[in-house]
């Protein structure tokens, strides 16, 4: 997949923050578009993907790139709030009748009020343990696109990564249903404000006043175009870069 044809803002973030002598972690590696691109820019990449269908395709794609495969370490499990069993739901928060594993939408949070949503029991590892085991010396960047799982692994937990910097984080948020929207999004924002001094929009690389944008949302159910919530959603959905570095 050529850079520029798929989420070009992600590749721009990679070009800015990945370093040839540092490793990075790709959470939600899917079938590997960011993994292969990032491997060319970093010392090595730890690709984490708990969806068994996506992981099989990821493995094939990595093997098809012999010039990069030695720099790519594949992990067939997910990052969870704690180490142990992890339930992965086809379609995640946005399950529909056609959702299936491997379509990039699998997530730790199930869709509300959807009985019979397909579920896969995977292995989960907490972020602190993963860093200690696999990337404790040289990780400077984490990409996170885990279809709603951000609401489980960031709040109250990201602060534990202080001994690693914490690494710069590029996270794509996925809007939950209205009933949980404010509580989940605010919990993540508050944790990131505690951990990082600088925030940038992946879409245009501009600095953002994250706390101010969140405080401007008074009606979290207002989905009208241009509403404060929709502006925040657009920023978070396209990718938020949280870092201690200047862009």
Whereabouts are the PLM-identified features?
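Phosphate/nucleotide-binding beta-alpha loop and adjacent structural elements of enzyme active sites
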Residues: 1-247
């Amino acid at each position: 997949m050529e850079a520029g044809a798929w989420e070009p803002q992600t590749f721009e973030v990679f070009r800015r923050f990945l370093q040839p002598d540092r490793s990075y972690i790709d959470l939600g590696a899917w079938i590997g578009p960011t993994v292969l691109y990032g491997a060319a820019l970093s010392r090595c990449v730890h690709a984490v993907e708990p969806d068994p269908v996506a992981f099989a395709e990821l493995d094939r794609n990595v093997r098809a790139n012999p010039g990069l495969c030695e720099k790519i370490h594949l992990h067939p499990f997910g990052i969870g709030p704690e180490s142990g069993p992890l339930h992965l739901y086809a379609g995640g928060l946005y399950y529909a009748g056609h959702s299936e594993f491997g379509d990039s939408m699998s997530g730790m949070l199930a869709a509300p009020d959807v009985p019979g949503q397909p579920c896969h029991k995977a292995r989960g590892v907490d972020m602190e343990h993963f860093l200690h085991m696999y990337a404790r010396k040289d990780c400077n960047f984490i990409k996170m696109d885990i279809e709603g799982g951000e609401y489980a692994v960031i709040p109250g937990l990201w602060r534990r990564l202080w001994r690693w910097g914490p690494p710069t984080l590029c996270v794509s948020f996925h809007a939950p249903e209205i009933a949980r929207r404010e509580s989940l999004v605010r919990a993540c924002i508050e944790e990131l404000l505690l951990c990082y001094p600088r925030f940038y929009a992946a879409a245009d690389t501009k600095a953002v006043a994250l706390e101010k944008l969140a405080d401007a949302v008074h009606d979290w159910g207002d989905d009208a175009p241009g509403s404060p919530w929709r502006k925040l959603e657009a920023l978070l959905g396209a990718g938020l870069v949280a870092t201690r570095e200047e862009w």
